[in-house]
Regions:
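Phosphate-binding loop of NTP-binding sites
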Residues: 3-5, 13, 20, 27-33, ...
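NAD(P)-binding Rossmann-fold cofactor-contacting core
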Residues: 33-48
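Short acidic low-complexity segments
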Residues: 55-67, 430, 435
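C-terminal helical cap/extension that packs against the catalytic core
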Residues: 380-441
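Conserved N-terminal Rossmann-fold NAD(P)-binding element of oxidoreductases
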Residues: 11-16, 448
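Nucleotide phosphate-binding/pyrophosphate-handling subdomain across enzymes
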Residues: 2-12, 20, 24-31, 180, ...
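Beta-strand->loop->alpha-helix junctions that form or flank phosphate-binding loops
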Residues: 38-39, 57-60, 95-102, 140, ...
Length: 464
């Protein structure tokens, strides 16, 4: 599909309110495409798009495709979606989000962030660095970047900063100039046939890096290290805590609202060997790694080190990544997107490092039955750095499959393996009641999950 011809088409996004779909549709609209879409319900992303004069249908119906000539779908769209069925019946071209994204940015110099965890924060950190320069990149992210108050922005330069979604393998269609591979974990196994299949997708993506580009690979990740052994070309740099990293993290100091660290740089033909006193308004070793990946790319692009440090220091954050929502009885309540065992573990680890004298309370809402079934054992060990867990009902995201095991026994396994106190709540009103009766003393509360838990956290201040 040629982009010049596509501007004459009407592009319909099924599930336009999704975080990745909303960003892509916004950029296409601002590029001059005719854009419309549908979603099952209204949300903040839909409201942002409506302000851009994008026509949005609430509810999925074949009638919504009346003027559509191209359909864009994400991995969240099921085969029985009535609009997808109608598009196939009418032989309207159906394109995956990742492939459409690749087409839109095919003529740009792309900085592409991939990996199982940390993509959104890393993409946002790169954006913050670029904002210290006169470069004006196009940005498409998987979360709302606070400094631009949106998930996406159409820039005027030939640079783009992209978060690429690995859930359906379509990230493989994007041609990176520079890329960051944060980590690779067992996830989206409904698409990937095996872990080897997942690894090969990432390996093939890395191999697409042109000779004039660079891949930045976090060497602290075990699977990343496996892939490094299979890469024959040398246009990649590594970053992390390990001694053989090209960008080695040193002298970490973490506080309640920020972290400081140094980097030892080991690169051929460079005048920069040590970068000291880097400050980021984030906690957690995982976020330090994310910022070093962003720094490495920015250096390769040619951004001066002081501007890079300023961009990291001035980072305004991204929504749903350890955001403070409110305080109650002098207890701070945070919201975080963590919904995979690894994400839960690293967030709680970061919190424990700086809030060691506090009781750490995690309100957890599992997201998708399929994920819980696939990673059940890992979930039971994920809460070791918490003191207590409030377990909410599963947010199914429309899945109609059976859990296949007792949810109560799952809760007992969390108590046993993570060594925490655990309380189960049946619904949001019960959660409110529990919190009102039990939140006192020296505590910190983090709501975690990718479903409705974020809305719950924002409703709590009105009800407590």
């Amino acid at each position: 599909m040629k982009i010049e011809l596509a501007k004459k088409e009407t592009v319909h996004f099924i599930g336009i309110g999704g975080i990745g779909m909303s960003g892509l549709s916004l950029v296409m609209k601002r590029k001059g495409f005719k854009v419309q879409g549908s979603d099952v319900s209204n949300n903040k992303n839909v409201e942002r798009l409506k302000k851009e004069k994008i026509k949005i249908f609430i509810g999925h119906s074949k009638k919504n495709l009346k003027n559509a000539t191209i359909i864009v779908i994400s991995s969240a769209i099921k085969k029985n979606n009535p609009e997808l069925i109608e598009a196939q019946k009418k032989k309207i071209p159906v394109i995956k989000r990742g492939k459409m994204l690749a087409s839109i940015v095919s003529l740009l110099k792309n900085i592409v962030v991939v990996g199982s965890h940390g993509k959104t924060t890393t993409t946002s950190l790169i954006t913050s660095i670029f904002q210290e320069t006169k470069l004006d990149p196009t940005i498409i992210n998987g979360g709302v970047i606070n400094s631009i108050k949106n998930t996406a922005k159409l820039g005027k330069s030939d640079w783009s900063i992209l978060e690429a979604d690995e859930s359906d393998g379509s990230f493989i269609h994007i041609l990176p100039t520079y890329s960051i591979i944060t980590n690779i974990d067992r996830e989206h196994m409904d698409f990937y046939k095996s872990m080897d299949d997942l690894k090969n997708y990432f390996l093939n993506f890395i191999k697409k890096t042109p000779s004039f580009g660079k891949s930045f690979i976090c060497i602290d990740d075990k699977i990343n290290r496996e892939l490094l052994k299979k890469i024959k070309f040398k246009n990649f740099y590594t970053y992390g805590l390990r001694s053989n990293s090209n960008f080695k993290i040193k002298n970490i100091k973490q506080f309640k609202s920020y972290s400081k660290f140094d980097i030892k740089v080991s690169l051929p033909n460079t005048k920069i060997h040590n970068i000291k006193n880097i400050k980021i308004p984030l906690i957690g070793t995982h976020n330090i790694r994310n910022s070093v990946g962003a720094l490495g790319v920015a250096l390769s692009v040619g951004i001066p080190i002081q501007k890079i440090k300023n961009g990291l220091k001035n980072f305004q954050g991204v929504q749903r990544r350890f955001n403070k929502i409110f305080s109650y009885n002098n207890i701070d309540f945070y919201d975080d997107y963590a919904h995979h065992p690894t994400e839960i573990k690293v967030v709680l680890e970061g919190v424990k490092n700086v809030y060691h004298e506090y009781d750490k309370v995690c309100i957890f809402q599992p997201h998708r039955i399929s994920r819980l079934k696939d990673l059940k054992k890992d979930f039971t060990y994920a809460f070791k750095n918490a003191d207590s867990v409030i377990l909410c009902p599963i947010y199914t995201a429309g899945e109609k499959i059976k859990l296949g095991f007792s949810y109560e026994n799952f809760a007992k396994e969390i108590i046993k393996n993570s060594k925490v106190k655990l309380f189960m709540v049946e619904n949001f009103p019960r959660l409110v009641k529990f919190l009102k009766n039990n939140m006192y003393g020296k505590k910190i509360v983090i709501g975690m999950g990718a479903g409705s838990i974020s809305n719950w956290m924002r409703e709590l201040p009105k009800l407590m």
